[in-house]
Amino acid sequence: LQEKSCTDFQLAVDDYLIRHRSILDVLTKHQEAAARVNRAVAKAVTECGCISIVAERQKIPADAEFNNLKAFMSSHLSGELCENCRDVLINELGHSLFYLTALCNLTGLDLQAVLQHETKNVRTLGIFNLS
């Protein structure tokens, strides 16, 4: 997100988060929203079938070099989201982002600063970040 978009979104969330303003509400709503993201992906697989999951052990050649590992790693995802499933997933990701931003607001964190901090960490740590 660009800085102005982050700021605008954070201000909008602050303006419109009224009913579930308690930190406990925000934490549980964020968790619920994350579960709905997972469910949207699962439904795209099991009900629509526009995508499928073909999971197996990652096949990495013994002589593969560390800096080339990404080329051998699979997402286990096959196909592309149809328009309907894409819309559902975008909607659910939006709700998740809404409550993540609400959590930032209630704890006094700037969403843009969080994104910049994490971007710096990812770039600094490279492939060792969250691996």
Each predicted region: which residue ranges?
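Flexible "arm" and connector segments at domain edges
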Residues: 1-93, 97-131
